[in-house]
């Protein structure tokens, strides 16, 4: 990390890098738009792109690449970005209160599930790939694991039909075999071939190797 920081001159530009980090947290768990982050931080786009690379190389964050194997609906080509720790995001945002119903609760819940997926991959299945899918028409699925399992994360305690739109749209492509919603419902159930799992059950099955 010291070499990367020295190479980019970060030690001489701490205020700018601090602005970058704060702006980067606003894109956490979202599509990564270097130009928007650059505008928010008052920096050049090329600088922001290079600094995101440093975050990845120093394992402070990770880009999730888009899943592009759809035909009926064209996929967005931007990656999503997740910091390595929820506490870091919260600290850089000034320690906002994260409560059920707050605007940050859903993205933080999604981030929490991503961190579990990433940990499972790193420790149990290093060859596995985590992707996400979003169509140009607005359909989205939060995670796709190994091009086999589509996972939508909802912080709700009751999942409705509208919450399944992205999974159903992806199912029409015929490229994915399994579909799950990870949520805060009290019990597992099945809805039109889509598994709806409490997050605790999902994590138990993930770490037990019973998702596929």
Label each residue range with its predicted role.
Residues 1-149:
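Accessory nucleic acid-recognition modules appended to NTPase machines
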Residues 129, 178, 193-195:
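Conserved beta-strand segments of alpha/beta enzyme cores
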Residues 134, 181-183:
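Short beta-strand/turn micro-motifs composed of small residues
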Residues 140-141, 159-162, 187-191:
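Short active-site-adjacent structural elements
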Residues 146-159:
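Active-site ExK catalytic segment of metal-dependent nucleases
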Residues 150, 180-181:
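Structural beta-sheet core signal
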Residues 156, 162-175, 179:
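Short, charged, amphipathic alpha-helix that recurs within catalytic cores of restriction-modification
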Residues 186-212:
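Domain-level recognition of nuclease-like catalytic cores that cleave nucleotide substrates
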């Amino acid at each position: 990390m010291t070499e990367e920081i020295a190479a980019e001159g970060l030690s001489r530009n701490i205020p700018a890098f601090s602005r970058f980090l704060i702006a980067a947290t606003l894109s956490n768990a979202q599509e990564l738009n270097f130009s928007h982050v650059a505008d928010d931080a008052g920096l050049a786009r090329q600088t922001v792109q290079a600094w995101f690379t440093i975050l990845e190389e120093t394992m402070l964050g990770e880009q999730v690449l888009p899943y592009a194997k759809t035909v009926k609906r064209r996929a967005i080509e931007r990656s999503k970005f997740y910091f390595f720790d929820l506490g870091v995001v919260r600290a850089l945002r000034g320690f906002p209160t994260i409560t059920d119903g707050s605007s940050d609760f859903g993205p933080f819940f999604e981030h929490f599930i991503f961190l579990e997926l990433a940990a499972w991959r790193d420790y149990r299945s290093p060859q596995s790939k985590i992707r996400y899918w979003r169509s140009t028409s607005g359909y989205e699925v939060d995670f796709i694991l190994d091009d086999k399992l589509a996972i939508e994360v909802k912080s709700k305690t009751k999942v409705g039909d509208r919450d399944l739109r992205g999974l159903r749209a992806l199912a029409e492509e015929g490229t994915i075999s399994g579909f799950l919603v990870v949520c805060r419902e009290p019990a597992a159930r099945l809805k039109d071939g889509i598994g709806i799992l409490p997050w605790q059950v999902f994590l138990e099955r993930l770490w037990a190797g019973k998702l596929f």
